């Protein structure tokens, strides 16, 4: 029986951190034994908010592949590929962009949240938002449909991106006939690792992460400086970690 195709991806903007590993990476390692698994290194999408630092993206591609192999992804079981090496993805992105309005992209909750988080790049009210960043959900739709991905591992916060992909598939198939596979969400209980500063999310750009490539002394220094709950004095005190 042919395995179902599952596709996921990650932007190369630095090494993997613990949030990546516990939130997604360890799940990918399990999925490679059950599905025809594709892992995309989304270097083109990484440029949408790193357009002024292409060297960072270029270097991070190699670092990211090494990290993915180190956590247990097996090239004999999972296909790891670099987005920019497949020109057909860029072609599909252009075709799909004709099926999506600017207003629809602006309403995407995930995109709206990310714009707010990147005020230093796009301005306080998003007045400097680029077409490339606003339209990255269209690029993601091209990634998924190019490989006929039936299942896409996502967290709850990423569901709006997958829903936009499904809308594109519906519209394309209505116009040109049943051609594209409609993807479904592969939801799993993935933990969200808090940042060292107490932030709800650990992130590279937030400067609150422990990276898989960190040296032991660096990890120790980061942990010693991490924010803890001042109300938890004794071990049996209730905590808010």
Regions found by a protein language model. Name each.
Residues 112-241:
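Active-site cores that bind ATP or allylic diphosphates and position pyrophosphate for catalysis
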Residues 1-13, 33-34, 66, 70, ...:
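Non-catalytic terminal extensions that flank enzyme cores
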Residues 2-141:
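N-terminal Rossmann-like or analogous alpha/beta NTP/dinucleotide-binding catalytic cores
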């Amino acid at each position: 029986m042919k395995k179902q195709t599952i596709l996921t991806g990650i932007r190369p903007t630095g090494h993997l951190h613990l949030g990546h590993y516990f939130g997604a990476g360890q799940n990918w390692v399990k999925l490679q034994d059950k599905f025809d698994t594709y892992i995309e290194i989304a270097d083109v999408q990484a440029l949408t908010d790193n357009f002024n630092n292409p060297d960072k993206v270029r270097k991070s591609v190699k670092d990211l592949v090494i990290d993915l192999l180190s956590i247990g992804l097996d090239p004999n079981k999972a296909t790891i590929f670099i987005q920019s090496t497949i020109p057909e993805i860029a072609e599909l992105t252009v075709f799909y962009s004709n099926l999506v309005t600017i207003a629809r992209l602006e309403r995407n909750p995930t995109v709206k949240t990310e714009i707010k988080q990147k005020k230093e790049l796009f301005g306080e009210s998003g007045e400097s938002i680029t077409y490339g960043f606003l339209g990255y959900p269209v690029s993601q739709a091209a990634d998924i449909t190019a490989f006929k991905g039936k299942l896409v591992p996502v967290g709850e916060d990423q569901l709006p991106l997958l829903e936009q992909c499904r809308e594109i598939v519906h519209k394309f198939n209505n116009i040109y006939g049943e051609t594209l596979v409609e993807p479904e969400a592969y939801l799993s209980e993935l933990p969200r690792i808090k940042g060292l500063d107490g932030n709800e999310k650990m992130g590279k750009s937030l400067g609150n992460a422990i990276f898989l490539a960190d040296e032991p002394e660096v990890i120790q220094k980061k942990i010693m400086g991490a924010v803890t709950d001042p109300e938890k004095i004794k071990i049996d005190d209730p905590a808010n970690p």
